[in-house]
Amino acid sequence: IWSGIQSAF
């Protein structure tokens, strides 16, 4: 999980 996606999840 990269920084952009981990914020969403």
From Swiss-Prot:
Tissue: Expressed by the venom gland.
Intracellular or extracellular location(s): Secreted
Broad class of the protein's primary localization: secreted
Domain of life: Eukaryota
GO cellular component term of the entry, any: extracellular region
Keywords noted in UniProt: Secreted
Keyword Secreted: yes
Keyword Secreted assigned: yes
Name of the protein described by the UniProt record: Venom peptide 2
